[in-house]
Amino acid sequence: MTDTESLVVSSDPKHPANLIVELCKLFYDNNWVTGTGGGISIREGDTVWLAPSGVQKERMQPTDMFVMDLKSRDYLRRSPTFKPSACTPLFLSAYTLRDAGACIHTHSQAAVMCTLLYDKVFKISNIEQIKAIPQVVESGYLSFFDTLEIPIIENTAHEEDLTDTLQAAIKEYPTCTAVLVRRHGIYVWGETVWKAKVYNEAIDYLLELAVKMIQMGIDPEGGIGSEKQGKFFRGLQG
């Protein structure tokens, strides 16, 4: 085995290349990364593993991975089959600006729908699942009564062209752990790959819930009891 192959071939199920394969299959089953869309990257120190472009996520193999040095931005290992992901500069933005250990990009339908329903920022409050989201600037997690805010940036024709606006959103919203891209999807990051996974799952739950609340005429940011003003509740009262 060559030195470069040893970067992606391992019997350890916790090896980044193996984890990316496992998680991409899981995200495919959740309908988040269909049609070769989306991606994931994991960082350990200055070494970054990246899912490639154009791969069917449920069929990905560890040997399909790219490996990069974070400081030099040089590839330590290239996929023999696929091209580098256009998401790469956005993943690197989460590493350099937030010291993240992993970054996930999905084309979640709930994420896309929320970008059509909200203007500049997605907001939701008074929902239990919010407690899974970190405060980022301060230690700990958001509380039930806190408001989760996720900035929304405009899509571009080419993924890499999102880099500047994504970086600007990260800087403008220092407490965010995700950025939505209008009519496109979402980027979510975390201190470790498992935390990024949890944040992504919790956020997607909240995005889907917000869409359903709006359909029922309920304000996702409304206070407790505001649901009684929704059209569905009023219809039940006859």
Swiss-Prot record:
Active site as annotated: 128
Record field: catalytic activity: 5-(methylsulfanyl)-D-ribulose 1-phosphate = 5-methylsulfanyl-2,3-dioxopentyl phosphate + H2O
GO molecular function terms attached to this record: methylthioribulose 1-phosphate dehydratase activity; zinc ion binding
Binding site for substrate: 87
BP GO terms, sorted: L-methionine salvage from methylthioadenosine
List of residues binding Zn(2+): 105, 107, 184
EC number annotated for this UniProt entry: 4.2.1.109
Record flagged with keyword Cell cycle: no
Cofactor(s) the protein needs: Zn(2+)
One Pfam family cited in the UniProt record for this chain: Aldolase_II
Disulfide bonds listed in the record: none
Keyword Hydrolase among record annotations: no
Listed pathway(s): Amino-acid biosynthesis; L-methionine biosynthesis via salvage pathway; L-methionine from S-methyl-5-thio-alpha-D-ribose 1-phosphate: step 2/6
InterPro entries: Aldolase_II/adducin_N, Aldolase_II/adducin_N_sf, MethylthioRu-1-P_deHdtase_MtnB, Salvage_MtnB_euk
Keywords from the UniProt entry: Amino-acid biosynthesis, Cytoplasm, Lyase, Metal-binding, Methionine biosynthesis, Zinc
Biological role: Catalyzes the dehydration of methylthioribulose-1-phosphate (MTRu-1-P) into 2,3-diketo-5-methylthiopentyl-1-phosphate (DK-MTP-1-P).
Family: Belongs to the aldolase class II family. MtnB subfamily.
Database matches in NCBIfam families: salvage_mtnB
Protein name: Methylthioribulose-1-phosphate dehydratase
Gene responsible for this protein: MDE1
